[in-house]
């Protein structure tokens, strides 16, 4: 099936003179998790991980994945004719190198410009120019192959009350206009979904587990435009947006709006704007390229959000405690497998007061499957739980009071000596990270070292981040917070610890 899809794509590429076609894991907004409509890479490869980039040439296909997905990709790509490229490993070409080698002098690479970030697109553009080659980005070729593609999500929009948001949308818009004025910007373009809904205090359900709304937003000193499917707005939300003096426009009209801008100073974050959007901006405009002000403001939680998040974690902790008690009481007594246990936890969480769903798909992994950082149990991989070894569960919920993310590794019975040692090392890592004191201005590199040192001393490591930011009734992974080498922690940031 995968081979047939790839061959169909290659026929379309030949007709258009394209030698290499890029299929990322992305929507039009650079979201980490995407709705079913945007799962083109999964459709073309069979790989279900949440990150990965496919490149198809006329005689080859390769998927780039990071260390979280090496084990999973190896399993899921078997028999697909798609090769795995382990990002960061010695001898593995970069995406750009692979594409450049596949495109002949005067040839062309292709992709849907709406799902490729502008930074990558411009870099590839410069590299291809050296071969007098071009980019064809006006057409979504996977759409022509995917005959039964799901419709784009259009879930109802709802208003997040100030008792939960802690700050009114009026106040946020006034603050944003003041910020624009200080930066000398006349227009600000927003394409990141979590930034938009945070700014307007609205939520939706257009991305699974992420309460966001498919939309774009533009604001000037005296106007504001929300580009959205109007069918998602009831009268209450329309009146609310009208009171905020936000004009509603159809979702796809954003490109016409951007093309109409002339001689403006436009504030945007180019790394978060798609290639097609950036190419739509007329050269008469000046771009003020910096991190979106909303991104930084959203990361620092206000006092109301902090207090509410404590309540959310207590609620979530009760559900987790009930689950762990049930698991330990019944292991070995009743049949259990990864999927049935996952459903048990999801049910306990969703019956909690104020729960609005999961914050990500639960990772329920027994034994060797727990080595896959973002493992997802399927009917084929579903493994029975036994009264021995480790069971890992990584899960979280969405509540009016906030977003949660918790991982636990549970001993179901006797352990090997190696399992005991590794568990103890991870525990030591957690304790060191939780206890470390650091001066303001210390970067994430310092904290990352504190967490990893006990493992490095024994010659082992883990191939994923040590911690990430968490949104408030938003994305479970929220930038720019994280235990990473350049990140400087701020007071009131919300960050997980997960060595």
Region spans (language model):
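Active-site neighborhoods and metal-handling regions in enzymes and metal-associated proteins
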Residues: 1-499
């Amino acid at each position: 099936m995968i081979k047939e899809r790839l061959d169909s794509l290659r026929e379309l590429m030949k007709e258009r003179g394209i030698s290499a076609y890029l299929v990322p894991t992305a929507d039009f907004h650079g979201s980490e998790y995407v709705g079913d409509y945007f799962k083109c890479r999964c459709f073309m490869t069979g790989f279900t991980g949440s990150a990965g980039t496919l490149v198809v040439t006329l005689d080859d296909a390769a998927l780039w994945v990071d260390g979280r997905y090496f084990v999973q990709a190896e399993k899921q790509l078997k028999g697909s004719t798609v090769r795995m490229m382990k990002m960061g490993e010695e001898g593995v070409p970069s995406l750009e190198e692979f594409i450049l080698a596949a495109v002949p002098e005067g040839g062309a690479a292709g992709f849907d410009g709406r799902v490729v970030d502008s930074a990558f697109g411009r870099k590839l553009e410069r590299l291809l120019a050296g071969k007098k080659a071009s980019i064809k980005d006006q057409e979504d070729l996977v759409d022509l192959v995917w005959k039964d593609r799901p419709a784009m999500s259009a879930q109802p929009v709802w208003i997040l009350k100030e008792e939960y948001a802690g700050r009114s949308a009026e106040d946020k818009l006034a603050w944003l206009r003041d910020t624009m004025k200080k930066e000398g910007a006349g227009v600000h373009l927003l394409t990141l979904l979590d930034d938009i809904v945070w700014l307007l205090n609205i939520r939706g359900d257009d991305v699974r587990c992420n309460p966001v709304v498919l939309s774009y937003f533009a604001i000037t000193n005296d106007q504001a435009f929300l580009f959205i499917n109007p069918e998602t707005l009831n009268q209450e939300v329309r009146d609310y947006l009208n009171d905020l003096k936000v004009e509603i426009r159809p979702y796809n009209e954003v490109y016409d709006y951007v093309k109409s801008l002339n001689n403006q100073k436009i504030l945007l974050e180019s790394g978060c704007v798609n290639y097609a959007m950036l190419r739509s901006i007329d050269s008469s405009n000046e771009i003020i390229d910096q991190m979106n002000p909303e991104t930084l403001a959203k990361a620092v939680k206000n006092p109301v959000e902090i207090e509410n998040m404590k309540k959310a974690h207590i609620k979530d902790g009760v559900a987790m405690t009930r689950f762990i008690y049930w698991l330990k009481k019944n292991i070995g007594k009743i049949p259990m497998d990864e999927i049935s246990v996952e459903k048990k936890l999801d049910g306990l969480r969703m019956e909690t007061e104020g729960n609005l769903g999961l914050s990500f798909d639960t990772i329920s992994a027994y034994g060797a499957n727990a080595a896959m950082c973002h493992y997802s149990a399927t009917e084929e991989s579903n493994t029975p739980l036994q009264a021995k070894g480790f069971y890992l569960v990584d899960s979280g919920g969405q509540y009016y009071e906030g977003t949660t993310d918790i991982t636990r590794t549970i001993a179901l019975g006797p352990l090997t000596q190696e399992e005991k040692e590794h568990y103890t090392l991870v525990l030591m890592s957690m304790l060191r990270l939780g206890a470390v004191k650091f001066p303001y201005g210390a970067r994430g590199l310092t904290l990352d070292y504190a967490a990893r040192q006990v493992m490095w001393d024994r010659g082992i490591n883990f191939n994923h981040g040590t911690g990430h930011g968490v949104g408030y009734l938003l994305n479970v992974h929220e930038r720019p917070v994280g235990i990473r080498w350049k990140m400087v922690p701020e007071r009131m940031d919300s960050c997980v610890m997960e060595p």
